[in-house]
Amino acid sequence: MAKPETENPYSKTVLLPETSFPMKADLAKREPGQIKVWKDQKVFLNMKEIRKSKPSFVLHDGPPYANGNFHVGHSLNKILKDIIIKSKTLSGYQTDMIPGWDCHGLPIEVQVLKNLGKEARNTGPSELRKKCREYAAEFVGKQGEDLNRFLCFWDENNKYLTMAPEFEARIVEVFGSLFAKGYIYKGKKPVYWCIDLATAHAEAEIEYQNHVSPSIYVKFAVKGETDTHCLIWTTTPWTLPANLAICFNEELPYSLFQSDAHGRLILADGLKEAVEQKTGITLTKIKSLSNADLKQMVFLHPFLDRESIPLFGNHVTLDAGTGCVHTAPGHGTDDYRVGTAAGLPTLSPVDDYGRYTDEFEMMKGIKIWDANPKIVELLREKNALVHFSEFTHSYPHSWRSKKPLIFRATPQWFFSIDHNGLRDESLKAIDKVQWIPDWGITRIRSMVESRPDWCLSRQRNWGVPIPSFTCKSCGLTHLDDKTIQHFIQIVKKEGIEVWYEKEAKDLLPADTKCSNCGSEDLKQDKDILDVWFDSGVSSFAVFGDSIGKEPADLYLEGSDQHRGWFQSSLWPSMAIRKTPPYKSVLTHGYVLDEKGHAMSKSLGNVINPTTDIINQYGADILRLWVSTQDFRDDVKIGKDSIKTVSEAYRKIRNTFRYLLGNTSAETLTWNLKKEELDTIDKYYLHKLAKLNDEVKKLYDTYQFHQVYHKILGFCTVDLSQDYFEIIRDRMYCDAKESKTRRSSEYTLAVILEVLSKLLAPILSFTTEEVWTSFGKKDSVFYSDFSDLTEWLDESLESKMKPVFETKEDVQKALEEARKLGKLGKSLEAEVVIDGKKDSLPFSSEELALFFVVSHVHFETNGIQEVFSEWKGESGSIQIRKPKHFECPRCWRHVSETEGKLCKRCDEVVSKLSPN
């Protein structure tokens, strides 16, 4: 039977690290308890209160839809915002971010109708709105829980909901202000229309997907000419019943061509070869046609008893088609523009659900998509079809129904983008905003320069009603300042639902009459405001509307919001306040799976931030992942990336654990001066000070991935690999009150305090846990980032540079000895350095500690066995067997007698109490 190993009699004399800070984080189980503590102690409110006299920093939160739980894209957005708020707080700002929720609109209404099933048909507007309100409130609650679980700080009693009575009243107020200033008008013009949902769509509600359309070349006969036609190309045969003109470009040359099978055809010279290639017909030029020739022509509709006139517009190009553009003013923006300028009616023979009306009698009631092949066949029968094929192209679809949209002229309310020079003023203002990344300014400028007037009205139930009325006698729309202001006062007192619960006479000022026929019998209109208008006026509801009102410091959303919320917020603010609602705009990319694919249920690659990450790994792991990403581009997430981040977290946590095991907050009260510290400690405080300055600047510029890399590198290389190894001997074996140990312990305390603060915006739970274990009484979020200017000393860089260069060579020589099987631990070696003694201004004892060996010599004489030799930049390095014995307490080979303590350890142990 083997004898039990004898316990080292000196083991209890060594000052090993001691801490209750657990190695295993167990984040998923322990974070909820900390969330409760933060709530109970009102940490978020207190951290704002103690900085109430400081400069403010306001991040205005873009409201997500109150529909479904937060997905991983939401977690990226919300955690980024929280990191910013916390880093600005620790930078000394009074910070604010009031979270908001977008509660109206199609996503919620469609889902509620789906939940109602057959009962939807029997559900009136008021009851439907009530259910929508309940549905939205439910998901505001669920998403609020998600926000808490992301470890985000927010005041649950201070949030904004677009369906809140005061917010709805504010929406109507802003609408009224814009109306009074002349920005709001009603007109019949083509807008994006969803025939499946029977409502208009704004540009921000459009998704582009591939779509297969018919591609047809059609000939329109020239009136009064024999076998002469104008050749047009279209991918929307269903719009041909609305054709009223053919548009040309005055800058393009046109000619009359002889075809082999379709008579004489008019088209642009620059598209002759393309037409021949697409259609297979052969064209021979007969003569050129001037603009005057084209202007005097009249064209005959191919299957209706109607004439089409020639028009001219610069939207006609040589990109595709024939250069002769089929023009239906009721079904296209360019068509509408040139058509109305020429006095053409806005013909749109299609109803809300995409069915032909009696304005196209022969196909009345047929849906447009079903009509496409019928119209193609009709053209073939009329000998007007030159060529048919199918064409795959990017086509606008509804963001909600996912079905193709059409352009359809309907009476709608619009926000005039060019009224009072608004577009030009907005472009000037955009140039004064900081856009991050900087390509953001190019993107939004191009959108603002080209966007049409904003269609504000929607033909749905769940939203804020546009307070317009219609005369029952003559059909005139009634809306004026007096009506709006009267309605606003009612809404403030009774809420927006009065629109659906009361009669028109109860909502109108007394004695209101139709300005056309004098009738007092008016009814409420049914249109509601675009939900993008709701969120677009959120800055008014949250911050006020005075001219010159200080804008928010930052808007932070996905890059798709250049055409969404960034614009919908810009227009009302510029029109009313004369300034943008933001000083800076920061965007992030989409979250993709690890292969770079978009997440979708059909692909089975959706990652749920709560169930897949937080409940398994903890929110701090998700937050750390966010900090690792250069979020300005699209980012990837998956099991491998979370595993990598978890490993990095473990290294950071172990660094904290070592620090906590060797020091405490009480150590900071020593307030040691620079001259009281050893050189190596001063050097690492200098490195800490540089890190501190760099990280603070990186937080200010939102480069969190660089914050992560800088701090991780400092923890794993500067501390764990170098500094902790260098001071291990003095921390474990020097006397507790020795100058050397106190110097290093104080340095560790400073490092711990500073690192806790620097990582607090990212690892909120872990740093709070560290802060408490350190012995701090208040939250880490009540503190500010440290000012370490006193520890900066560039002279230490030059002093220590040759030491670390030599250490690299020593490490290579030690590794060579290990490969030869002659060395185990580095303390079993002594180092002989031949050369460069003058460049290493430290004693042999100090260098031995730096290199973690037992001895360092500068003379090559001696009889000890040479383990290995290395010739490097610092000269020749020999690794030799030490001539002294191993100390049984510190394990260094510095003892004069085998089995006995070295001089230092003997002095320390002799002074210890026998108890």
From Swiss-Prot:
Organism of this sequence: Leptospira biflexa serovar Patoc (strain Patoc 1 / ATCC 23582 / Paris)
UniProt record, GO biological process: isoleucyl-tRNA aminoacylation
PANTHER family given in the database record: ISOLEUCINE--TRNA LIGASE, MITOCHONDRIAL (PTHR42765:SF1), SOLEUCYL-TRNA SYNTHETASE (PTHR42765)
Quaternary context: Monomer.
Protein name, per record: Isoleucine--tRNA ligase
GO cellular component: cytosol
Family statement drawn from the similarity comment of this UniProt entry: Belongs to the class-I aminoacyl-tRNA synthetase family. IleS type 1 subfamily.
KW Protein biosynthesis (keyword) present: yes
Gene Ontology molecular functions: aminoacyl-tRNA deacylase activity; ATP binding; isoleucine-tRNA ligase activity; tRNA binding; zinc ion binding
The entry's keywords: Aminoacyl-tRNA synthetase, ATP-binding, Cytoplasm, Ligase, Metal-binding, Nucleotide-binding, Protein biosynthesis, Zinc
Domain notes: IleRS has two distinct active sites: one for aminoacylation and one for editing. The misactivated valine is translocated from the active site to the editing site, which sterically excludes the correctly activated isoleucine. The single editing site contains two valyl binding pockets, one specific for each substrate (Val-AMP or Val-tRNA(Ile)).
Motif ('KMSKS' region): 598-602
